[in-house]
Amino acid sequence: MTRLIELRTRFGQEPLGRLLQARLEVLEDGRAVVAAPAGPELMIVDGVAQGGVITAVADYAAVYAAMTRVPAGCMPAVQISVNFLRPIGAGETMRAEARVVSDSRSQVVTSVEVRGDDGKLKAVATILFAKPSR
């Protein structure tokens, strides 16, 4: 089984991903796109998506982009930085596109853009992952 097929299968088994109804729309070397609906159960009282939910969707895209760079294993996030630019409203789809921007011997750095249905940038993230021990 190739790594990309293995990762696609793995994504479908993610318990939190299933809870978020997340979909892996694109997976290729160094890039992943994950989409999830911003349902009412993921909102704060003001009717916008809770920041941790947006971060989780960004993290899923980032880790799957990062995992395309290693032959096996998972990669723990060691640092996450997120800037929230615009709210994501109930019923919108959160779409996170992650790209690997640095790939060294011990870590992978990703850059993530999260957009809503209107195509506008809602959040940006930089997420650093540790590579598995060899």
Residue ranges and their predicted role:
Residues 74-77:
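A short coil-to-beta-strand element that immediately follows conserved catalytic motifs
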